Design a protein with these regions (language model features):
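Active-site activation/catalytic loop segments of kinase-like enzymes and analogous catalytic loops
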Residues: 233-267, 278-299
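Short Pro/Gly-enriched beta-strand edge/turn motifs at strand-loop
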Residues: 12-19, 60-62, 185-196
Length: 329
């Protein structure tokens, strides 16, 4: 991370003098430093960008944090400063631990956060929020999003035995299973219509316990809103149950759907989730294989310069294969 840019961002945040900076360790998409000034701790986050992935993560997250703050939602790290020149954010450092396993209480807390956000849908600030990354408002759009990911994986270059193993998995298992699933969903949804505006939700996107910290006060703090915006609530729920880092048992899906459908999207949400859940199980298998694509590999190295790329690729392939076998035995 460029130190003059970091110092400029910290100065804008009113932080100067004796500041200690250190790597924050393993992160997903971005380069993060932990800073300390006296008894004050904070994070400096630099956002990844790549020609193959031009999404403006910095501006999306800044806009969403502003929306949450204006709405009085406090279960988030407090933003301290934004520095567009270096695509840097300075955020409150939340003391606590990542949840190691989902519990009914944590799931309820996460859904309370999601619903609290969506009670602000009629606020003026909500109208200016962008569409979420890969937003989908019809079954066809959900299918097209995953189809695009499958097609990208079909272009993995055979540059190592690990890559060849990934290619074999995509060709022999992932792609054939997807073709069968896609055709079945297309038949089942032939008469489905697109979502009305009032059926859409404000989605944190990439929503799950992998993007939370349990604060020392016992409550969750939610973060990482780089893909947030308007979306289909069924997609938000499917992602929540499909993300692999802190799995949420499908047994809890009915209670979540009952809670959410009372406030967002109505009874149609449950039907779309039932239809689309295997689509999103496939999507998350694709996401696990992003490390075999140039933009995915470079994003990981950007966030963690010391990363052992070969070891991670091996682990990600094993996870993708296991997840796919569990979902599609």
């Amino acid at each position: 991370m460029n130190e003059p840019l970091v110092r400029a961002a910290l100065q804008q945040a009113g932080l100067s003098g004796d500041i200690h900076l250190e790597s924050f360790g393993v992160t997903g998409n971005n380069h993060v430093l932990l800073g300390r000034a006296g008894d004050r701790a904070f994070l400096i986050k630099q956002y990844f960008q790549h020609p193959d992935d031009p999404r403006d993560r910095f501006e999306t997250e800044r806009t969403f944090y502003a929306f949450l703050s204006d709405a009085g939602i406090r279960s988030i790290p407090k933003p301290i400063a934004w520095y567009p020149e270096g695509r840097l954010a300075v955020l409150e450092f939340v003391q606590g631990e990542k949840p190691r396993a989902a519990t009914p209480g944590l799931v309820q807390e996460a859904m309370d956060f999601f619903l609290e956000i969506n009670r602000q849908r009629e606020n003026p600030g909500a109208k200016s929020l962008p569409l979420a990354s890969e937003a989908c408002f019809s079954v066809a759009e959900h299918l097209a999003t995953v189809e695009h990911r499958i097609q990208r994986l079909g272009r993995i270059a055979p540059e190592s035995p690990r890559h060849e193993a990934a290619i074999n998995f995509v060709r022999a298992r992932l792609s054939p299973a997807w073709i069968h699933l896609r055709e079945r969903i297309e038949r089942l949804s032939a008469q489905a219509s697109s979502l009305d505006v009032n059926q859409r939700c404000i989605s944190p996107s990439d929503f799950g316990f992998h993007n939370t910290i349990r604060h020392t006060d016992g409550r969750l703090r939610f973060f990482d809103f780089e893909y947030a915006g308007w979306d289909d609530p069924a997609k938000t729920i499917c992602d929540f149950f499909c993300q692999p880092a802190v799995p949420v048992p499908n047994d809890w899906l009915p209670s979540v759907l009952e809670k959410v459908s009372r406030e967002i999207g109505g009874d149609d949400v449950a039907g779309r989730v039932a239809l689309l859940l295997p689509v999103y199980q496939t999507k998350w298998c694709c996401i696990m294989l992003n490390d075999f694509l140039p933009s995915g590999s470079q994003r990981r190295l950007f966030s963690n310069p010391g990363l052992d790329d070969s070891r991670r690729q091996k682990e990600q392939l094993e996870k993708a294969m296991a997840s796919h076998e569990k979902a599609f035995p």
